[in-house]
Amino acid sequence: MAEKALEAVGCGLGPGAVAMAVTLEDGAEPPVLTTHLKKVENHITEAQRFSHLPKRSAVDIEFVELSYSVREGPCWRKRGYKTLLKCLSGKFCRRELIGIMGPSGAGKSTFMNILAGYRESGMKGQILVNGRPRELRTFRKMSCYIMQDDMLLPHLTVLEAMMVSANLKLSEKQEVKKELVTEILTALGLMSCSHTRTALLSGGQRKRLAIALELVNNPPVMFFDEPTSGLDSASCFQVVSLMKSLAQGGRTIICTIHQPSAKLFEMFDKLYILSQGQCIFKGVVTNLIPYLKGLGLHCPTYHNPADFIIEVASGEYGDLNPMLFRAVQNGLCAMAEKKSSPEKNEVPAPCPPCPPEVDPIESHTFATSTLTQFCILFKRTFLSILRDTVLTHLRFMSHVVIGVLIGLLYLHIGDDASKVFNNTGCLFFSMLFLMFAALMPTVLTFPLEMAVFMREHLNYWYSLKAYYLAKTMADVPFQVVCPVVYCSIVYWMTGQPAETSRFLLFSALATATALVAQSLGLLIGAASNSLQVATFVGPVTAIPVLLFSGFFVSFKTIPTYLQWSSYLSYVRYGFEGVILTIYGMERGDLTCLEERCPFREPQSILRALDVEDAKLYMDFLVLGIFFLALRLLAYLVLRYRVKSER
C-alpha cells in the first residue's frame, strides 16, 4: 500500500489524490471534495532568463503610412492594381506581445510579411527600426519568422534538430552550444521528448520546437503567423504563455491571431486590428471595450471582446468600418488611451529608450562559413535519407527485386545471337527503370523539403549554395549504390560478356543515366509550386525522352524537323553507350544454335540499331554535360524562387 501511495506522489498527485487512491484500494466510497479546485498556472517563466543565449540589443519597430498593392490578373493580362493595405501607422515596442487581429482577408498575414521583410515590391511608406530606416538584410538577421505550418524534417530527433540550429547559428564552443540547447529545451518543456523524432510530436510540441529552433541565436524580434491554429485550448495557452514570457524577456513579439479565447485575448499587451486592409483599432487590450463604448458600440456582458470586435469588423452590426477608420486616423485611439490612464493628463508610456547595443549585427554574412554550413547540412541530409524508409529502404529493395525479376525473365540470353532484340529490350528496360527510380523519388520529396528550406534560409540559417551542394552531394552515394546493385544482378544473370571492363562501363553508364534523371527531378521539384504539379510533370517529361531514345524509332526514321529532339534525350546516350559496351569494343561472334543467325556478328547489331559510328566517350561526355546543366538550372530556379519570396 505504501508503494502505491509513493507512486501516486511521484506522478505529481497531491495528498488528497493519494488518500483517494488508498480509500479506493480498500473498497470504500471516495471522499467528497470540500474545497474548490484551484487551477495550476503553467506560465513558462524560464523563457525570460536564458543565461547562455547571446546578448542582443532590443528593437522597436515603427511604420508610417504603410500601403501595399499588387497587380491583378495573370502576368499576360494585367488588369490594374489592387490595394491590400492602406495607410497603416503605428509602433511596436520591446517587451510587448502584439496581436494583429481581423477577419479573414483583412490583410493580417500580408501586413506581417511586410514588417518581416518578406514583401518589398508594391510597398509604400516607411519602416523604422530603433528610429532609423530599416536596412533589410541586417533586420532579417536580427528577426525570425515562425510560419503557421510547422515544417520540420521528420526524421531528425528534437535534440538533433536543435543542435543543427545551434551549429549553424552560433560560433561558440560545442560545450556552450549543448548547454544552451539543454536550457532552451528545459524552459520550453521539450526535454522529455528530446530523443523523439519530430514526426511523432504533438501539435503543441511541434509549435514549441519551431520556436526553440529560432530562439537559439536570441532574435530580438519574432514574428508568428497564426501560432494557435490547429491546437487545443491547453496547447494554445502554452504557446501564448511562452510568447508572453519571451516578450517580457525584452523581445518584440508580433503575431497574427484570428479569434482567440477571452483568456488568451487578455494575455496580449497591445492589439492592432485590421479590416479591409485598414486599421480599426490600435492600443492596449484593456482599452478596447471602453474605446468601442465611446463610439456607441457596446460589447454584450459575458461576451468575448475578441469575438465582438471581429463581428463588428465583419459587418454583423452594419457597415461600421468607415467610422472606425476615421476614428483611428483622427487619433481617437490615442485620446481614449490617455483618458483611461489613472491620471487624466498622463501621456501613454512611450517605448523605452534604446540602450547601447550589446551585440550589434552589422555584418551581412552568415554566422558560420559556407564550408561549415555545407558540412552540417550534408550530415543532416545524409542522416535524413538514411532514416527515410520510403526514399531509401524501399528504393534499395525495389532495385534488388526488379533486378532479380529481369534476370529471371531474360536469363542467359546475352550471348545468344537469336535473341539479340530480346537482349536489347532488356538493356533498354534497365535504362528505363533506373531513370524512373531516380526521377520520381526526387520529384515526390523535394517539393516537401522546399518549405523547410524556405523557412530556414529566409531566417538566415545558411546560404543557398551551401544547402544546394549538401542536398545534391548527400544523395549521390545512394544514387550510385542502387544502380550498381541492380547492374550487378542483371548483368550476370542475363549472361552478358564476362569481362570486368564491360561490366564496369555498363554500371557507369547506368549510374550516369540515373544521376541525370535525378538532376531532372531536382529541377522539376524546384520549379513546381505543389506536389501535385510535380507528380504530373515528372512522368510527362519522360515521354519525349523515351520516344527519342533510339529504341522505338531509329534516328534516320525520325522526320528531319524533329531530329533535333533526339539530341535532347539523355536516355538516348545512356542506351547508345550500353549497346556499344555490350556489342562493341571488338567483341567476338555470338553463339547461335539455329541454322540462320543474321546477328551472329556484333557489328551487324550496331548497324541495325544505327550506332555503328557512335563513340562511347561522347556518350559519357554528353551525359556529364546534361548532369551539370540540369544541376545548374535547378540552382538558378531555386535562386529565383527565393528572390520571389522576398
Curated annotation (Swiss-Prot):
Q: Which InterPro entries match?
A: AAA+_ATPase (IPR003593), ABC2_TM (IPR013525), ABC_transporter-like_ATP-bd (IPR003439), ABC_transporter-like_CS (IPR017871), ABCG_dom (IPR043926), ABCG_transporters (IPR050352), P-loop_NTPase (IPR027417)
- One annotated GO molecular function: ABC-type sterol transporter activity
Residues in ABC transporter domain copies: 61-301
Q: Which residues lie on this side of the membrane: Extracellular?
A: 415-425, 494-503, 554-617
Question: Could you tell me which residue ranges are on the Cytoplasmic side of the membrane?
Answer: 1-393, 447-472, 525-532, 639-646
Query: What is this entry's stated membrane topology?
Result: Multi-pass membrane protein
A biological process term (GO) from this entry: positive regulation of cholesterol efflux
Q: Which GO terms describe its cellular component?
A: cytoplasmic vesicle; endosome membrane; plasma membrane
Task: State how changing K108M affects the protein, per the record.
Answer: Abrogates ATPase activity. Induces a dominant-negative effect on ABCG1 ATP-activity. Does not affect subcellular localization
Residues with glycosylation annotation: N422
Please give the tissue specificity annotation from the record for this chain: Expressed specifically in the brain and the eye.
User: Where is it chiefly localized?
Assistant: membrane
Which PROSITE patterns does the entry mention? ABC_TRANSPORTER_1, ABC_TRANSPORTER_2
Record-annotated ABC transmembrane type-2 domain positions: 386-641
Q: What is its EC number?
A: 7.6.2.-
Amino-acid positions noted as binding ATP in the UniProt annotation, renumbered to this chain = G102, P103, S104, G105, A106, G107, K108, S109
Q: What class of enzyme is it?
A: translocase
Subcellular locations according to the entry: Cell membrane; Cytoplasmic vesicle membrane; Endosome membrane
**SUPFAM superfamilies from the xrefs?**
P-loop containing nucleoside triphosphate hydrolases
Q: Which UniProt keywords apply?
A: ATP-binding, Cell membrane, Cytoplasmic vesicle, Endosome, Glycoprotein, Lipid transport, Membrane, Nucleotide-binding, Translocase, Transmembrane, Transmembrane helix, Transport
Q: Which family does it belong to?
A: Belongs to the ABC transporter superfamily. ABCG family. Eye pigment precursor importer (TC 3.A.1.204) subfamily.
Give the quaternary structure.
Half-transporter that forms a functional transporter via homo- or heterodimerization. Homodimer. Heterodimers with ABCG1.
The protein depicted here goes by the name: ATP-binding cassette sub-family G member 4
The encoding gene:
ABCG4
